Regions:
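SH3/SH3-like beta-barrel fold
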Residues: 17-21, 29, 46
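Helix-rich effector regions associated with P-loop NTPase G domains
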Residues: 3, 15, 38-52, 57-83, ...
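Conserved lysine of the Walker
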Residues: 190
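Phosphate-binding glycine-rich loops and their immediate beta-loop-alpha structural context
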Residues: 88-137
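Beta-strand/loop nucleic-acid-binding surfaces
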Residues: 25-40
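A residue-level detector for short acidic-glycine micro-motifs
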Residues: 8-11, 57
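Canonical P-loop GTPase G-domain recognition
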Residues: 120-186
Length: 330
């Protein structure tokens, strides 16, 4: 066995990290030097000549999950092949927060699947689907964001989820697992999903916490788990990320935010806004505002309300991104 090898970070905690080499048991390693900062699912160079082993290098990341409020950045995980964004109607998820996460995922070129959880609860599920419709593209503008129903109470409650994972997570190479991130606001049922997908997750978390002497709950930092797979199935890694109430996007620009509002580019196919940097807020000659007025004048109130709702959500995201309000004074 070589003294230096490539390992995968399963959980990082300060100057320490649990790492996995191939499918071997995890080992506790230390970061070499203050300039090295590891996050969950990083690929790293591990020197096993020392005791404990040392992480000497972080290999290039294909992407990273992060949220940011001003100068405070929180990197959650790296090298993600699919993000599962968990929603529910009890408690109700926030359409605005969901759009924030989606914009962050699109900016990092991370495919995502919206999972409406707790689908065994009829009333809350209908409320969740109504909220989901607010963030779906208007039918004529773009395809729907991919979504499924799921629940942990019924025998077949996760069948659709397993099928989507099988379709959307091809192995990166013959020697690597695909990596799936589990994300969601607090209370969406993410932990229940995790415990079904990885039955020994609690035991793994407890062992790691005891070794790190952290005593921290599983949802305070990201942790990767190897998902049990039937013989012949591809290997998968599931990354549980901390639940959140807010999701900062000050690291995103206006184009990133616009990626989850395809209506704006579709509307401008018939004619551009007067100003190239139009923020679709109060500027004269704005095609978005014109479309809302046209719908009102034509008595198409449902369309007008849908566009105005989109515009309000857009304004909220834009004010939080690295994209100042560009109200023209020309």
């Amino acid at each position: 066995m070589p003294d230096r090898c490539i390992a995968r970070v399963m959980r990082a905690h300060g100057a320490n990290a649990w790492v996995e080499v191939n499918a071997e048991a995890m080992v506790l390693a230390q970061l070499k030097g203050r300039s090295i900062e590891a996050i969950t699912n990083d690929r790293v160079v591990l020197d096993r000549q020392t005791d404990p082993p040392q992480i000497t290098e972080i290999l290039e990341r294909r992407n990273s999950l992060l949220r940011q409020e001003g100068h405070r950045e929180k990197r959650l995980a790296a090298n993600i092949d699919l993000a599962l964004l968990i929603l529910s109607g009890e408690p109700s998820f926030s359409p605005e927060t969901t759009l924030r996460v989606m914009a962050g995922l699109v900016a990092q070129q991370i495919p995502f699947l919206l999972v409406v959880n707790k689908s065994d609860l009829d009333g809350p599920t209908q409320m969740a689907l109504k909220s989901l419709s607010r963030i779906q593209p208007m039918p004529e503008t773009a395809p729907e964001w991919p979504w499924i129903l799921a629940n942990t109470k019924q025998v077949n409650g996760l069948d659709a989820l397993h099928q989507e994972i099988e379709l959307n997570c091809p192995a990166v190479s013959s020697s690597e697992s695909s990596s799936i991130a589990l994300m969601g606001e607090s209370g969406m049922g993410k932990s229940s999903l995790l415990n079904l997908l990885v039955p020994d997750a609690n035991a793994q978390t407890q062992a790691i916490s005891e070794a790190l002497s952290s005593g921290r709950h599983t949802t305070t930092s990201s942790q990767a788990y190897r998902m049990p797979q039937a013989p012949g199935k591809r290997s998968l890694r599931l990354i549980d990320t901390p639940g959140f109430q807010r999701f900062g996007i000050s690291h995103l620009d206006r184009e990133d935010v616009a990626s989850v509002f395809p209506e704006w580019s579709w509307l401008q196919q018939g004619g551009s806004c007067r100003f190239q940097d139009c923020a679709h807020l109060h500027e004269p000659g704005c095609v978005v505002q014109a479309a809302i007025k046209t719908a009102v004048d034509a008595g198409q109130l449902a369309r007008a309300n849908a566009l105005e709702d989109k515009r309000i959500l857009w304004e909220r995201l834009l004010s939080s991104a690295n994209a100042p309000d560009r109200r023209s004074t020309r």
